[in-house]
Amino acid sequence: MGNDAQQGPDRGIEIRPITHEELADWDRALALGFMRPHVPPATEWRELLFEPGRMLGAFDHGFPGADRPRCVATFRSFDTGLTVPGGERLPVDAITGVTVNSTHRRRGLLSGMMRRDLAAARERGSAAAILIAAEHNIYGRFGFGSAVPLAGWRVDVLRSGGVRAGLPVHAGHRIDFATLEEFGKLGPDLHERWRPTQPGAIGRPDAWWRLRAGEVDLPGFDWKQGFNVFHRTADGTLTGMANYTVDDKWDGAYPDCPLTVRDFIALDRETANALWAFLFSVDWVRHVVAPHLGPGHVLPLLLNDPRAAKPHEETADFTWLRLLDLPAAFAARRYEAPGRLVLDVTDREGWTAGRWALETAADGTGRITHTDDPADLGLDVARLGSLYLGGGSAAALADAALLTEHTPGAAVRADTLLRTARAPWNPDGF
């Protein structure tokens, strides 16, 4: 189901799905919103992503001198699967391409597009929605909470002493360079094998692989042909890959090249150890930069001197989550401790509001149902979304006065039920 046409909140501005013929106008509005020049290759990229009913535009019918309404705000969504604790794929609505031209701000256009899309997502059966926020303070009012951060590292290779010797690796393994064709052919299957192991991960559509292979252009995406390496075990099974670039930089007669890790997938710890050891052994490299790792990543602990690893400047919140169907979402994930907790949830849209009892069992299953029992915790749906994937801390939210503890110790109990040993991580923008 798409999004039905509807008059926008500002008189003379109509919010509706765009037609295929309006792609160029929609992309022009998006470029203005992101403060980039509009160029034809961007429209080619939108062609790959076009899905009837899922690209919304706000059209100004009163544009001076225009022979047709002009697009002044953009919004796109698509369906994907979000890996939740335990490995299940939760059906979610992924939101992207959200802009409002600076000439049309404060007119309710974002609110109109967002509420239309979220309502349609609930009807389609999406249990949650996700997005990446350009600014921290925009999306909380729509029920989104920061659920998956990024935490990268910048490592001085000489000071680090490299990766420690003796780390476990697969006996007889090998690492080989791969062509772009091999990357595009074998990478998708490897990613699909890895994705169920990592809460917070999402699918990579065909367009994602084509973009990373340099087959299509996208303004704002700084594609540079890098190096792809595959890791195989002794029997030839592909268990990992890394994609990286190396900048040609010298300090006089001495190489001072930074190596930037753009993609890293390992199905097990042995594969990861071997790939990191390889990356830290590349000739002429002075710094290894890994900007898009997950929180608590072990990279510094793999080094002879962990102090050589400095937090990357892009470390920040990344994926935001908005719960739409609490029973479906909480039944899909797994839990690491049994227990019961009653939550009083507020939701401006009313979709998830009410008193809910979360019950988890020793076998890892759980459910959430309506109840009239007294609440242990009071919180809004955005804060619940930040806890859902197992990476947030209810105790920290309580200390920051971002939720209300009605029963002493309830925040710690919430962490016992909801937090997971494996932190959520999503390496992919969308």
Task: Give names to the regions the model predicted.
Residues L30-V84, G200-N228:
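Active-site rim helix/loop that mediates acceptor-substrate recognition in acyltransferases
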Residues I95-R122, D268-F280:
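Conserved acetyl-CoA-binding loop-helix of GNAT-fold acetyltransferases
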